[in-house]
């Protein structure tokens, strides 16, 4: 503990983390300030807000939003920082089918535009199948298997 590993500070500038509970990361007084906080520019923040469908909420307080809106704002705020790696912890929790489809479409568009790596932690088979190129099945903290989309289908098909 006396010495940090070399380069330990560099990773947090490259990795954007979105927590399962958006309340853990929403702290600014408006959606605009939340998404603009770490954004590479105000214009890019507005572009990301538009992509995530939250631009119309620009002047609202994040805590006044629905859970689905909070989730989209929290992901948009991290995405606006333009990280090389976007780590999403259960991004579709609490979403109805329409919300899940919309969020998956947004995340796929974001990936196509930015070219960033997305790592998604999920128990939602639909989310995994729609977002992943590679899948890792983990049990008791150990990777049991890895593969492509076919692994998701194979593992979760009765």
Please annotate each region the language model reported.
Residues 142-158:
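Conserved beta-strand-loop-alpha-helix hinge in the C-terminal portion
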Residues 75-76:
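Hydrophobic anchor residue at the start of the ABC signature
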Residues 61-65, 69:
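Conserved ABC ATPase signature
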Residues 122-123:
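H-loop/switch region of ABC-family ATPase nucleotide-binding domains
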Residues 128-130:
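A short, surface-exposed alpha-helical micro-motif characterized by mixed small hydrophobic
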Residues 43-57:
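Conserved ABC ATPase "signature" region
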Residues 86-89:
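Catalytic Walker B motif of ABC-type/P-loop ATPase nucleotide-binding domains
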């Amino acid at each position: 503990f006396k010495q940090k590993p070399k380069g330990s500070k560099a990773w947090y500038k490259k990795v954007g983390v979105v927590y399962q509970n958006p309340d853990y990361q929403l702290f600014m007084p408006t959606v605009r300030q939340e998404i603009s906080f770490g954004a590479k520019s105000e214009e890019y923040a507005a572009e990301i807000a538009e992509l995530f469908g939250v631009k119309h909420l620009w002047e609202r307080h994040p805590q006044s939003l629905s859970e689905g809106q909070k989730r989209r704002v929290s992901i948009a705020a991290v995405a606006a920082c333009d990280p090389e790696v976007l780590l999403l912890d259960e991004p579709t929790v609490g979403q109805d089918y329409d919300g899940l489809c919309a969020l998956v479409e947004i995340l796929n568009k974001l990936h196509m535009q930015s070219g960033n790596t997305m790592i998604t932690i999920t128990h939602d088979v639909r989310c995994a199948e729609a977002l992943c190129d590679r899948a890792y099945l983990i049990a008791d903290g150990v990777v049991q298997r890895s593969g492509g989309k076919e692994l998701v289908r194979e593992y979760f098909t009765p």
